[in-house]
Amino acid sequence: MASLSNPRGKVVLVPFPFDDLSTTKVRPAVCLTHAIGPYQHVLLAFITSRIPDQPLPTDIIFDASHPDFASSGLRKPSTLRLHYLMTARTSLILRELGRLSDATQSDVAQRLCALFTN
């Protein structure tokens, strides 16, 4: 995808590195920022289809009961992991899946503030 207009809040597919940096896997992620600078960098948060038994304060579960599940474009219940982040160029984004509501984006922002201030 050459460029993504107004990416903040969008759910996208992107090659996301494993936490040991051994390889990457195409995964859904949420764009946390608008594109920044001449290289059009965005901050992304990882989404996994695994639902933890004990969600962390940085986890948001998207399932049939979440109001944004349908608009997210996710095919199955998933967990947004706000402590698992990366910065990438928008040119690495393969496809847009959906979008988070303003209410969910506010929830994301509050959880990120708590993560970085505690």
Predicted segment positions?
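Conserved functional hotspots at enzyme active or ligand-binding sites that engage polyanionic ligands
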Residues: 1-118
